[in-house]
Amino acid sequence: MLLWLADLLGSHIRAFNVFNYTTLRAVMAALTALTISLLLGPWVIRKLTELKVGQAVRNDGPQTHLVKAGTPTMGGSLILLAITLTTLLWADLSNKYVWLLLAVMLGTGALGFYDDWRKVVYKDPKGVSAKFKMAWQSAIAIGAGVFLIATAKLPASTELIVPFFKTVAYPLGAVGFCVLTYFVIVGTSNAVNLTDGLDGLAALPTVLVSAGLAIFAYVAGHAVFSKYLGLPFIPGAHEVVVFCAAMCGACLGFLWFNAYPAQVFMGDVGALALGAALGTVAVIVRQEIVLFLMGGLFVMEALSVMIQVTSFKLTGKRVFRMAPLHHHFELKGWKETQVVVRFWIVTMMLVLIGLSTLKLR
């Protein structure tokens, strides 16, 4: 919106021209989303408490979690509101990627909201069925893939880019691209949701990975920088930086209330949406493999569940004391805050390794 004002009034009021700079709008987007989250957070928590949308706690989980029962959930709605308002304010609304990201995020957020609502209001511990959830996520992911193919301007927009190599890129074709997009978006969405099991555990890694992807988006959207660093040039990808910045600010603001001991939980409405958004950003900037690396924490959490389920079905034995992985370490004696901070440190390391692929090619 402000960029539109800059185009309209820039020739008359020179001060408006500063809004043409992506980096400035990204910084302002982060600050705006952070402010919205901090200001609206107490009100949202009060409303959720009044509605009695309290979190149910697993009886077979760590006993220290029993005190969390009744803590308001669905706080991710605050994150989505902050991201949406901020993006509409600071992003270029003529950019196709902006609308795609909002559509994917809000679409999966609606699924998460419905799932949370069934759990806490209708007292249905299972929420929506796995088939329904997968169908909804699949429709959104495949729709995003079809949209990106239909609007692609350059062959590089649909190639699989291999990090650490300047010239290694595999043409995927329409079907291959849609399949990859499906697995990245749906997989990341569910992986972040599985990670969101401890106070603050999912919020900061989302900030870190989003910030890392924002750097790739800035480079990919700049013809000179992308050529110098050996990345594909994706026209318009620079505007993704504003969305990522809004995500960082919104999640940091939410973390203020979600840090141990949490006053509110993200819920599926936040975790599913943020994961899908991260996956979509990676697909847009053609850095799916880098997302797999930087989001290694999410990958490990998801793999721990798959390994646990598969092992128990085949052998009747469990590999981990409990899945997802963060509960395994809790049952080994780690305090919740130790698990969270150590997982944050691991994510920082993985994001830095991912960023190193910008130059190590």
Swiss-Prot record:
Its EC number is 2.7.8.13. It is a multi-pass membrane protein. Keywords: Cell cycle, Cell division, Cell inner membrane, Cell membrane, Cell shape, Cell wall biogenesis/degradation, Magnesium, Membrane, Metal-binding, Peptidoglycan synthesis, Transferase, Transmembrane, Transmembrane helix. Pathway: Cell wall biogenesis; peptidoglycan biosynthesis. PROSITE patterns: MRAY_1, MRAY_2. Its main location: membrane. One of its GO terms (biological process) is peptidoglycan biosynthetic process. It is found in: Cell inner membrane. It comes from the Bacteria. Its cofactor is Mg(2+). It catalyses: UDP-N-acetyl-alpha-D-muramoyl-L-alanyl-gamma-D-glutamyl-meso-2,6-diaminopimeloyl-D-alanyl-D-alanine + di-trans,octa-cis-undecaprenyl phosphate = di-trans,octa-cis-undecaprenyl diphospho-N-acetyl-alpha-D-muramoyl-L-alanyl-D-glutamyl-meso-2,6-diaminopimeloyl-D-alanyl-D-alanine + UMP. The chain crosses the membrane at residues 25-45, 73-93, 97-117, 132-152, 167-187, 200-220, 240-260, 264-284, 289-309, 338-358. It is an enzyme of class 2 (transferase). It holds the Pfam family Glycos_transf_4. PANTHER family: PHOSPHO-N-ACETYLMURAMOYL-PENTAPEPTIDE-TRANSFERASE (PTHR22926), PHOSPHO-N-ACETYLMURAMOYL-PENTAPEPTIDE-TRANSFERASE HOMOLOG (PTHR22926:SF5). Belongs to the glycosyltransferase 4 family. MraY subfamily. NCBIfam families: mraY (TIGR00445). HAMAP family: MraY. This is Phospho-N-acetylmuramoyl-pentapeptide-transferase. It comes from Chromobacterium violaceum (strain ATCC 12472 / DSM 30191 / JCM 1249 / CCUG 213 / NBRC 12614 / NCIMB 9131 / NCTC 9757 / MK).
